């Protein structure tokens, strides 16, 4: 993802989760009601993406967490797209008859419909013959790249406190919670558009991995956030994933949890154990992004969903 009601304690974070759920409930249910009845069969079409047989027509939509910036081998410099990102790994396992990866670093939901530099509108790659579509989007809509930069810049003001959380809550409302809630209907519109273009496709909404540990001690200097901002940023990531999970459920798509499988491999871990690079990377990958091992882990989560049925969301 490139681009004073104080809530410092557990009770504050609980209220924030309730607020997020309420906002998403009112917005995403309205958005979900707009899905045409014919599109509701998207999760159970005849094409199917599961299993390992040939003949699959797979399209990958997404941002930099999908494209894999700086991970060798880069095959599209304009979108920082690697041929070892998770869509490429999944496509290799599927032995897809056709595979089109149009993910692009910096993409927001609007780039599903609008060109992004030389990368065309991502939804243009989806057609009636598509039978598997993965979507990983939303992080840039909330400005996650700038959030990371802001929190790093504010940390020296109060190294053991939560200056970043205070910054985003200075109006009495947590602005990141609001941004996540506002992004929900945008993601819903993307899923509706995929359903309309590929009515028989299996649609997977891919969540974001675990970036940070619960306790930020020992993370500096590679991850220079204030101590009490670590749980705030961690919870923001969880709220983003919760939104994606709910919007997927309400729009007849399947959610892929990449957070759980990556816990313990965040950017504060040793180079041997980390799957997310810190702000000063030691492996070829973008700061605060999955490295090659992280892309493999996300591919594993997608594959697990593909091969273990459609029952859960």
Regions found by a protein language model. Give the residues of each.
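Secretory targeting and sorting signals
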Residues: 1-40
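Structural recognition of the beta-strand scaffold that forms the well-ordered cores
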Residues: 57-62, 66, 98-103, 131-136, ...
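A structural motif corresponding to the C-terminal end of an alpha-helix
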Residues: 92-97, 186-202, 236-257
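Charged, often glycine-rich, active-site loop that binds/positions anionic groups
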Residues: 106-123, 267-282
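Short amphipathic alpha-helices and their capping/turn segments at secondary-structure boundaries
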Residues: 36-57, 116-134, 139, 187-202, ...
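Oxyanion-hole/transition-state-stabilizing segment in secreted/luminal serine hydrolases
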Residues: 69-71, 114, 118-178, 210
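Serine-esterase "nucleophile elbow" of acetyl-processing enzymes
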Residues: 44-106, 123-124, 152-158
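Catalytic His-Asp segment of secreted/periplasmic serine-dependent ester chemistry enzymes
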Residues: 209-313
